Regions:
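Extended amphipathic ligand-handling, pore-lining, and cofactor/metal-binding catalytic surfaces
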Residues: 1-167
Length: 167
C-alpha cells in the first residue's frame, strides 16, 4: 500500500564501522579494496554484513519488480568519528531530495522490532530533516514487531530447532 510510481523505496540498514566489517575478510584483499566489494559474492565476503544487506535488498527489489531508479540503500545509526558503511541514510535522503524525489518510503530490514533506531531516528528525526530539505512525504514502514505471521514463522523455526533437542 505504500509504493506507487512517484515513490522511492529506501532500504536503511543499521550501520557498522568499517573496521568491524573488514575483520570478516580473511583475505585482507577484498573489503574496501575492491570497487563495490559488497556487491560481489566471493569467499572473502561470504560472512560480510554489507554483502548480506545488499543481497537482501536485491532480493526484495526483484520480488517487487523495481527499476534501479525506484530504490536505494543506506546505513543509519552512526556514532563517533570513525569511518562507517556508506552512504549514510541522512546523506542519501539529501541526495534524493536534490534529485527531485519528494516521496520516500523507508524500510529497515535489519530491525525485527521497532526501537529508537526506527521510531526516533527514522520516523521523527529523518522525517524532520527530509521536510526541511524540501521533501513532501516520508513513510517509515513499521517493523515486524508482533505481527501474527512473523510470530507464527518464528514459532515454527524455534520448534524445528527444539525438536532434535527434545526428541
Amino acid at each position: 500500500p505504500h509504493l506507487n510510481e512517484n515513490t522511492h523505496l529506501l532500504f536503511s540498514y543499521h550501520g557498522l564501522p568499517i573496521s568491524h566489517v573488514k575483520r570478516i575478510d580473511a583475505s585482507k584483499k577484498h573489503c574496501q579494496k575492491v570497487a563495490n566489494c559488497c556487491e560481489i559474492a566471493c569467499d572473502a565476503n561470504a560472512l560480510c554484513y554489507g554483502r548480506h544487506c545488499s543481497e537482501t535488498t536485491h532480493a526484495v527489489v526483484e520480488r517487487l519488480g523495481l527499476t534501479d531508479e525506484q530504490w536505494s540503500m543506506s546505513y543509519q545509526s552512526r556514532l563517533g568519528p570513525v569511518k562507517w558503511l556508506e552512504p549514510a541514510t541522512t546523506s542519501k535522503v539529501e541526495d534524493l531530495v536534490n534529485r527531485g524525489i519528494k516521496n520516500i518510503v523507508v524500510v529497515a530490514p535489519a530491525f525485527l522490532a521497532d526501537g529508537l533506531e526506527t521510531l526516533e531516528e527514522l520516523d521523527i528525526e529523518l522525517r524532520e530533516d527530509f521536510l526541511e530539505m524540501g521533501g513532501e512525504d516520508l513513510t517509515v514502514v513499521k517493523c515486524l514487531n508482533d505481527d501474527d505471521q512473523w510470530i507464527d514463522g518464528l514459532e515454527s523455526l524455534v520448534r524445528k530447532r527444539l525438536d532434535p533437542i527434545t526428541a
